[in-house]
């Protein structure tokens, strides 16, 4: 095998506040850790991600989402490493974020961190939403077992588009 393997784990999981509503998180940081950090700082917007298995890097890479929320709604920028070793910052509006996709799936860059802008919220409200969504997940998924992620795709837009073509 010719190439490089990046292991994004506990050595690449720093998380910190940049200002009152902006969080910086490294790619190896788990989404659960990021969501709990936001909760501790009374910041809302990431509740949808609580319980999604995976890391910040993976969530940015595939524009992770659930329960009407997506990474594209809260990310402002991401840092990555290009094949030539240079570090690059991409603003959210240049990431081509769409349903479960981003520019990183085509450009080969390795995501190293992300910056998220959230809104001020009430701790109890944020926690209640996280608990509610985790309860919904538990009722539908066997969370006690390892997960390879989503195996289903939301086809609502595709079906509507297909239906429109059929009608026209």
For the regions a protein language model found, what residue spans apply to each?
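N-terminal glycine-rich flavin-associated loop
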Residues: 7-43, 70-89, 118
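Conserved active-site and cofactor/substrate-binding residues in soluble primary-metabolism enzymes
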Residues: 10, 29, 33, 47, ...
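Phosphate/pyrophosphate- and phosphate-bearing ligand-binding catalytic cores of soluble enzymes
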Residues: 81-168
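A gly/ser-rich beta-alpha-beta helix-loop segment of oxidoreductase catalytic cores
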Residues: 32, 38-76, 82, 147, ...
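A short, glycine/Asx- and small/polar-enriched loop/turn
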Residues: 1-3
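Short N-terminal helix-initiation segments at or just after the protein's N-terminus
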Residues: 20-25, 50-60, 95-98, 139
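Acidic/polar active-site rim loop that often engages polyanionic ligands
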Residues: 16-21, 60, 109-113
